From Swiss-Prot:
Protein name in UniProt: Peptide chain release factor 2
GO cellular component, one term: cytoplasm
SUPFAM superfamilies in the cross-refs: Release factor
Domain of life where this protein originates: Bacteria
Length: 365
């Protein structure tokens, strides 16, 4: 004989949490807006304005993720209740187990939707840029920056995000001096915003003939792609624009023309670079877009006294502003803010970051 009361209580609990989320996420308004967006996208002339059409498509995906999930939860709970009644009437343990398994699946789906409440910031739903910068440690730090880039690219791929390498400056011997990656996908900035900070690597260096233990640092800085309509005042006199030959991977045209662009905002010291297009003009436009996004992020951080301003985050790539320690010869990676750690170092370096990211978001970092 199987015990049905715990399952009934779980159904009630999941139903109650679903209703709370329904209200919190404003399901009715989102369903109405989804119908409006679908109607707009069905108009034959919608692609006359490609940017608007793309924005509508992105909005539809975001709305569907909420509306359809809540619909599935509510219908699923009805189905599970029906299965449970059948199992009791027929005294059928197989049907009972099926109901329990379906309920567990619904609970996981609900937990994923509940997690979206962590993404309440104005730009959490936006695409984002990730700047990586090698710090203390010479070639070892430059190799570490390259390892971090691979880690984040793997993580993005595992979540179904698209990535573009905007800028990549090779190290003197190996690895990278710096790189900028654009990460494209729903809530990309929300997921990655707590990764800003210094990452410390401790290992026996493959670049040391004596095999000694080395400590090196590289920094990550995450900022959202801001809407072109956001009014960010940039005085042209505050900008220094340099052109140069691209030094990283980029196809046959790299190093043949000075198409890469570096923009420095002199008052703040902020720098953006782009080299991923043959056209200097397009690279300049992209670098300006990144500069606008960085200045916006700086302004937002200045307004929020609970966050470190960007100058602090970028100033000292060393001991002072670490967020995570990767001690490879002890097989231990630990987040210094949340205390979360793992001994499966290779999995993390292969992009398994969710445990660290989720803990930092839940901690309100």
């Amino acid at each position: 004989m199987f015990e049905i009361n715990p399952v009934k209580h779980k159904i009630e609990e999941v139903a109650e949490r679903t209703q709370v989320l329904r209200g919190y996420l404003d399901y009715d308004a989102k369903k109405e807006r989804l119908e409006e967006v679908n109607a707009e996208l069905e108009q034959p002339d919608v692609w006359n304005e490609p940017e608007k059409a793309q924005a509508l498509g992105k909005e539809r995906s975001s709305l569907e993720a909420i509306v359809e999930t809540i619909d599935q939860l509510e219908q699923g709970l009805e189905d599970v209740s029906g299965l449970l009644d059948l199992a009791v009437e027929a005294d059928d343990e197989e049907t009972f187990n099926e109901a329990v398994a379906e309920l567990e699946g619904l609970n996981k789906k609900l937990e994923q939707l509940e997690f979206r409440r962590m993404f309440s910031g104005e730009y959490d739903s936006a695409d984002c840029y990730l700047d990586l910068q090698a710090g203390s440690g010479g070639t070892e730090a430059q190799d570490w920056a390259s390892m971090l880039m691979r880690m984040y690219l793997r993580w993005a791929e595992s979540r179904g995000f698209k990535t573009e390498i905007i800028e990549e400056s090779d190290g003197d011997v190996a690895g990278l001096k710096s790189a900028t990656i654009k990460i494209i996908g729903e809530y990309a900035y929300g997921w990655l915003r707590t990764e800003t900070g210094v990452h410390r690597l401790v290992r026996k260096s493959p670049f040391d003939s004596g095999g000694r233990r080395h400590t090196s640092f590289s920094s990550a800085f995450v900022y959202p792609e801001v809407d072109d309509n956001i009014d960010i005042e940039i005085n042209p006199a505050d900008l220094r624009i340099d052109v140069y030959r691209a030094s990283g991977a980029g196809g046959q045209h790299v190093n043949k023309t000075e198409s890469a662009v570096r923009i420095t905002h002199v008052p703040t010291g902020l720098v953006t670079q782009c080299q991923n297009d043959r056209s200097q003009h397009k690279n300049k436009d992209q670098a300006m877009k990144q500069m606008k996004a960085k200045l916006y992020e700086l302004e937002m951080q200045k307004k929020n006294a609970d966050k470190q301003v960007m100058e602090d985050n970028k100033s000292d790539i060393g001991w002072g502003s670490q967020i995570r320690s990767y001690v490879l010869d002890d097989s231990r990676i630990k987040d210094l803010r949340t205390g979360v750690e793992t001994r499966n170092t290779q999995a993390v370096l292969d992009g398994d970051l969710d445990k660290f990211i989720e803990a930092s978001l839940k901690a309100g970092l």
